[in-house]
Amino acid sequence: MRGLSIALAALGLGLATPLLAEPSPSVQVQVEAALAEAPKGTRFGLLVVDEAGKVIASVNPDQRFIPASNTKMFTTAAAYALLPGMDQPDVAGGTQVALRPGGNKHVPDVVLVGRGDARMSSASDCKVDCLTTLADAVAAKTKVVRDVIGDDTAFPDERWSPGMSWNNIQTEDGTAAGALNLDDNQLKVAVVPGVVGKTPTVTVPAYYTVNNEARTVAASSTPTLALERAAGSNRLRVYGEIPADSKDWHQWIGIDDPALYTAWTFKGLLQARGVKVIGQPRSANRSRDPLIDRACDTCGVGFAISGTPEPFASLTPPPLAEDVVIIDKVSQNMHAQVLFHRVGAHIGTGSTDWSVKGLQQVFAKAGIPREGYDFSDGSGMSTYNRVSPRAVVALLRWIDAQPWGKSWYASLPIAGVDGTLKHRFIGTPLAGNLVAKTGTLNATNALSGTFRAASGKRLTFAFFANDVPDGQTALPTMEAVLLGIAASN
């Protein structure tokens, strides 16, 4: 494959230990041969080094690639580096509840104050970080409230990643993220077939209304059922065909205003506890203001919102380190985006700009070349993100030297064992061995992490495939390359 760049000894990783020597010609030949079998037009980037920094394999290591969910590695590493008490209960992020005096016969509004927790749950079997705990607290204090307000103002109102494809907004992968979140900001839509020729039964929480255009068709027919929801709309269109013998069909959909959904859910919980709600659920948001962003250059650590009523009850979520495991193992986009804004809120206003500044501060200290990355979000859903293989390897080697490095590496999927790598590399020497973050986006595959080669050497790698032709995948090629490198070293 033409255009393969072989790293020279003079090129470093931005770390104290430089890259040493050229990759072995035999290994490089193997890599070239494997990449030649990839879908035509695919652009690859690869860098593999050993523990001493010696380059094992190198393909376009300084070119920049869309990283997809490899972005999450940068987000979670920055969180570990900047946010205090990652291994302690997340007192700073827990949702609070307050009563705000109202003008209607002095009936107060109830306000849920979000502070950047991505894990709060309304599930009936919830044990920790439960919205019902706050509902119980309100019911013990008053029997009537006016409006139920979801206060999302701890972060600016930037619910989606700049550069995210609009068609992802209705999906669970592209659901909105904010300071106040509930149930992963997604809802389940279930469809059960009916009598042939009739509409099936669609079940979804009443937060959404349904336009059911679907039809039940003869058993053994090909299902064509689909969902559609316009951005900003709470109306679902269900259409297509479901066979009469189909098992229950379900799909998760995103939520555009998580704070409003949380307030809507909280209203129901209050009513179930005998609290009369005479008003409506609504959300309170804070528009992003570039002037405030610039003014915060001198605001110190963090950014305080004025006018928030004094809370009388709070939740304490589990440690953020546990959420890092969720983010990296299963590649949870919304959680990653919330953590990204937590980084920005720690040093500034919580805006995307401040969150990016937080990442840049950390990576400058790590010696990661600035030209090696650009980020527009924390999850990897943005197509504006760019990283080089060299920048990723630099990040991974720097993390190795941090006191929290082992905890961070434990959050990554293990090949053939768990997370997004559970069904990959099975039956190969890399099963149970390779530990890495995956990444998948339109025309993009990514995989970066570490593995033990046949010799026992621990190798660190970053591997990207961009511009993969539609309907094809680069994964078999990438896996073949890594297996070959493992066997040859």
State where each predicted segment sits.
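Conserved serine DD-peptidase/penicillin-binding transpeptidase domain
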Residues: E22-P25, V29-A34, A81-R370, A454, ...
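Small-residue-rich helix-loop
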Residues: I56-V59, V330-N333, Q337-N489
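Bacterial N-terminal signal peptides that target proteins for export
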Residues: M1-A7
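Short beta-strand scaffold segments in enzyme catalytic cores
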Residues: L46-V48, G93-A98, S448
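Short active-site loop at a secondary-structure junction
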Residues: S58-A78, L82
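A short, well-structured edge-of-sheet supersecondary motif
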Residues: L35-V59, R282
